Amino acid sequence: MRLAVTIIVLLGALPAQSRTVRVAVCQILSIDGDREGNFRRVEYALEDARAAHADIAAFPESAILGWENPDSHRMATPIPGADSDRLAALARKYGLMISIGVDEKDGDKLYDSAILVDKTGKILWKHRKLNVLAWLMAPPYSEGRPEDIGVVETAFGRIGLVICADTFVDQVAKRVEQLAPDLMLVPYGWAATVDKWPEHAKELEKLVAKRAAQWKCPVVGTDVIGVMTHGPWKGQTYGGASVVVDSSGRVIHILRDRDVEVRTVTLELGRAVR
């Protein structure tokens, strides 16, 4: 798989000194197909994030329609489009940067996407998942393009997005490493059968820690709460236990096991030197 670097510069280069950012890890409940309820739960989390003086609110994968939900083929909207417009309005209302997984319709294709929206409501970046686990839904998500992996310069530094199973792929992880982000925000839909929890959370913890150490930057891996309702993994549980790891690969926060939580953490940005 041939990968190329994509970097978009929106603001001037930031000074090299240490800087911090407050990230609200928004481990919300997402119910498949419940667009209005899921938007309501997103807004509840944003209320908590603003009250905690967060700068960024980080949400899970497919937070609006649910992951691997075949109904998304008819329900999803383009980006930009109705769902991303609503998220932009929420970013403006709460004065927060938002990263969130949003299923995206583009013609007859459905993408498992994530967007980064600044506090003015501008979409700074969109990532389409590459490692889509095609056997879980028919028709499956379309794959993103490797050449579109990138980072974006923001008021907080260079921020990148990948999605869940993208972090399994060493070639994707290597390209992220080459992009030298200051912060990676990774929406997850980390599912397993009920008997595998809470042990399954340890696998998420190890994976996020591995990539943070490789990328030499903090990584926020935000998982969702809920249950899969379609496909071969029907009935599997999203168990939360979202993970925050510092630039050395040290796990510094793990959110609640199988329960909703919004936790705001202060992260020191900048590349680790090792």
Named regions from a protein language model:
Residues 4-13:
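Bacterial N-terminal signal peptides
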Residues 19-30:
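Short beta-strand segments enriched in small/hydrophobic residues
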Residues 22, 113, 148, 241-242:
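Conserved beta-strand and immediately adjacent loop positions that scaffold enzyme active sites
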Residues 27-29, 60, 128, 223:
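Residue-level recognition of beta-strand->loop/alpha-helix junctions
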Residues 35, 40, 44-120, 126, ...:
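Cys-nucleophile CN-hydrolase/nitrilase-fold catalytic domain and related Cys-dependent amidase chemistry
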Residues 79-99, 168-261:
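CN hydrolase (nitrilase-like) catalytic-core segments centered on the catalytic cysteine
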Residues 89, 105-183, 187-188, 193-210, ...:
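Active-site catalytic loop in hydrolytic enzyme cores
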